[in-house]
């Protein structure tokens, strides 16, 4: 079948009779492609008849070929400049049906509203830490990587700067990591005058630190924003070293369903290759995260990485009060060569 941005445009079924150990080439009639977007040719091999080992229609293999058609047209838009307020503590951007407030004391965005609905409860925080897995613990990673825990969680907010552009307001917050050797990193918010918000975390790298578990931005959102759908690799959780069996498509789940029932709470629910992610409540109030250039990794859970880290068992987790959305540039894999010393690849 042919898909565009996860939506099936055309599908077809044909039969093959290929003896074991041989191969055969089939000619496909391809759908005409005349618009920009990401396209996927998806081929799935299923059993034609019921056998002793599988029912008819059982998938035994699949493959996907992904390609993109660029849109070279530059849209002509006339933007009405929103009201920008520069206060002692708050910088506010107020436009038609949206408002954004940036806190110079807190060090980030403190309010994001669309149609008077508030989406965040606290300034998003950069995190370099994940809740350690059983494999991580077996490889002594909590000890080896401990500096990354403090680096993000206890980072010191230092300065803020801003630049008003023709069609956006760019605000950059600078932090100093709580580790030795220390380093600075920035979070830049670009408040576009059409209501979109661009976010960029910049980490230049530092020598003398162990491998980084994750580079992510954590959003603490309202509890009712617990449903999510995304276009990326799925349908189940997957990681950089556990994604070969995942397929690109449109998937949906909830924060509760995304929490794995491990005896010892730990990192779970990650997705790789994500192009877009929409988090919404039952009334369809929603916020969409979209890739800027490269696909990202993400998770939507009822607990933060630090809450999962602190609990020894599931019943020690607190009552659900928020939905935690993690947008990550990259996270290390989960390993599995063994659980008593082998690090992740």
Where are these regions (language model features)?
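Beta-strand/loop-rich accessory regions of lumenal/periplasmic or secreted enzymes
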Residues: 29-36, 66-345
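Intrinsically disordered, low-complexity Pro/Gly/Ser/Thr-rich segments with frequent PxxP/GP/PP motifs
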Residues: 2-46, 50-56
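Short beta-strand elements
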Residues: 50-76
């Amino acid at each position: 079948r042919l898909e565009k941005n996860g939506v099936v445009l055309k599908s077809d079924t044909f039969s093959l009779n290929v003896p074991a150990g041989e191969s055969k080439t089939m000619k496909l009639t391809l759908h005409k492609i005349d618009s920009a977007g990401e396209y996927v040719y998806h081929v799935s091999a299923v059993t034609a008849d019921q056998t002793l080992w599988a029912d008819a229609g059982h998938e035994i293999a699949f493959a996907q070929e992904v390609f993109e058609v660029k849109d070279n047209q530059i849209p002509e838009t006339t933007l009405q400049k929103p009201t920008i307020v520069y206060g002692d503590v708050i910088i506010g951007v107020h436009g038609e049906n949206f408002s954004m407030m940036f806190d110079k004391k807190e060090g980030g965005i403190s309010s994001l509203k669309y149609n008077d609905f508030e989406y965040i409860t606290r300034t998003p925080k950069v995190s370099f830490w994940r809740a350690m897995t059983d494999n991580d613990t077996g490889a002594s990673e909590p000890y080896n990587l401990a500096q990354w825990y403090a680096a993000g969680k206890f980072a010191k907010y230092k300065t803020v700067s801003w630049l008003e552009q023709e069609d956006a307001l760019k605000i950059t917050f600078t932090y100093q990591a709580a580790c030795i050797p220390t380093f600075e990193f920035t979070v830049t918010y670009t408040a576009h005058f059409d209501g979109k918000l661009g976010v960029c975390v910049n980490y230049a790298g530092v020598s003398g630190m162990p491998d980084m578990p994750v580079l992510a931005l954590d959003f603490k959102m309202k509890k009712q924003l617990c449903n999510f759908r995304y276009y990326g690799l799925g349908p189940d959780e997957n990681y950089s070293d556990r994604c070969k069996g995942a397929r690109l498509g449109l998937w949906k789940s909830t924060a509760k369903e995304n929490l794995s029932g491990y005896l010892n709470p730990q990192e779970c629910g990650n997705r790789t290759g994500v192009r877009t992610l929409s988090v919404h409540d039952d009334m369809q109030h929603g916020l969409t995260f979209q890739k800027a250039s490269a696909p990202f990794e993400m998770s939507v859970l009822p607990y933060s990485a630090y809450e999962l880290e602190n609990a020894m068992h599931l019943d020690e987790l607190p009552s659900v009060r928020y939905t935690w959305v993690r947008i990550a540039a990259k996270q290390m894999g989960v390993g599995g060569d063994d659980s008593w010393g082998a690090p992740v690849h």
